[in-house]
Swiss-Prot record:
It is an enzyme of class 2 (transferase). The gene is apt. This is Adenine phosphoribosyltransferase. Gene3D superfamilies: 3.40.50.2020. Its main location: cytoplasm. It catalyses: AMP + diphosphate = 5-phospho-alpha-D-ribose 1-diphosphate + adenine.
Amino acid sequence: MSRTKSVQDYIRTIVDFPHEGILFRDVTTLFADPRGFRIAIDQMLHPYAGERIDKVVGLEARGFILGGAIAHQLSVGFVPIRKKGKLPGTTISQDYKLEYGEAIVEIHDDAIQPGEKILLVDDLLATGGTAAAGIKLVERLGGEIVSCAFIIDLPDLGGRKVLESMGMDVHALCAFDGL
């Protein structure tokens, strides 16, 4: 008898992408499979059953796919956090460090109201830089992060520790060792 596939079984690993020595964890194979995608969304929702969540915030770009599906299931709004210059209207921005240099993400300044309970989602937690910047944006608007949810955690890169040091609750469906 075959065992039931786990979320991790649906994720493809691509060697040496985007650079030599990197094992790229490709969630597009998970998204493309209806059963795999359903399992992932259901498992991402499970820890928050009965908990108040007012909006889901998704980090660009795969966090939009997950965040939209999760917000739909929760019957709440979805808010994107995007790279600088991609949102129309008035925004606030937050810079964060990359391996080589810096980047900036933005959110509409009216997307979250003070006191709203927010679930932050993305596909992968690596160093935690993008998620930490997203958390800061939400908090600057007065939102309260209920939790941060990811499909994949790369524990060797320390992102979970970064977010937990900010007082965040962190959930990931699976973890992969290495880079």
